[in-house]
């Protein structure tokens, strides 16, 4: 893998973990990041059912990406997302979180990682309404990360924090609408078809 891009950007190359790595979103994180020049997947974590197994065995027939499981991760032993928090935090610079749990459980788990001084970039909706958690589309509102010091004060952390992304449909069209807002656009009709996104997946593998 060519590291020259990351070196040219001030050594932004980072070690990261994926929490919820066996689910569909976790799989997508893997395909996007396994060859990314800025990132190095150091940890894959999932539920106790998958923990302790090589990733290719843990995900098994649930793998639903068009690409094969990347060689870099297929033999990586899956860690326990809820029991290995401190250990995971010590191994990475930050984590991407895509766990499939109840919202209150997700909120608690993400705060545990943050309090272990591990920054969390969350794909989940659990913290989208937490006042001091920034929900960022970098092209639109990068200044929202300025709330992080307040969040750290609440959590009692020096480095750890939580940041979230918006709903997946919004990130597709809002960046295009944003520059049009100055022209006085008042109404927009948007149709999304998220319920169809899993139609090609067989029933046992839907999560």
Specify the residue positions occupied by each region the protein language model found:
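Glycine-rich phosphate-binding loop and adjoining beta1-alpha1-beta2 segment
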Residues: 35, 41-73
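Conserved anion/nucleotide-ligand pocket segment
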Residues: 20, 164-202
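Rossmann-fold NAD(P)-binding glycine/threonine-rich loop
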Residues: 104-157
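Single conserved hydrophobic/aromatic residue that forms the stacking wall/gate
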Residues: 1-13, 199-207
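Conserved acidic residues
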Residues: 10, 93, 118
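N-terminal Rossmann NAD(P)H-binding glycine-rich loop of SDR-like oxidoreductase domains
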Residues: 22, 26-30
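A structured beta-alpha segment of the ubiquitous adenosine-cofactor-binding alpha/beta core
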Residues: 66-107
């Amino acid at each position: 893998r060519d590291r020259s891009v990351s070196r040219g950007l001030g050594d932004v190359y980072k070690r990261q973990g994926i929490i919820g790595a066996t689910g569909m979103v976790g799989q997508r994180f893997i395909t996007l990041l396994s060859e990314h020049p800025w990132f190095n997947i150091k940890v894959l974590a999932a539920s106790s059912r998958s923990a302790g197994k090589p990733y290719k065995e843990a995900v098994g027939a649930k793998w639903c990406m068009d690409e094969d499981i990347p060689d870099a991760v297929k033999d990586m032993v899956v860690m326990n997302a809820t029991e290995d928090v401190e250990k995971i935090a010590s191994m990475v610079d930050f984590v991407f979180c895509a766990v499939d749990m109840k919202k209150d459980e997700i909120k608690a788990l993400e705060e545990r990682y943050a309090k272990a001084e591990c920054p969390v970039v969350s794909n989940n909706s659990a913290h989208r309404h937490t006042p001091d958690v920034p929900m960022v589309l970098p092209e639109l509102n990068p200044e929202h990360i300025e709330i992080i010091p307040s969040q750290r004060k609440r959590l009692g952390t020096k480095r750890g924090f939580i940041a979230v992304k918006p709903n997946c449909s919004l990130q597709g069209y809002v960046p295009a609408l944003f520059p049009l807002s100055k022209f006085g656009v008042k109404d927009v009709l948007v149709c999304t078809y998220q319920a169809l996104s899993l139609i090609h997946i067989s029933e046992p593998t839907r999560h």
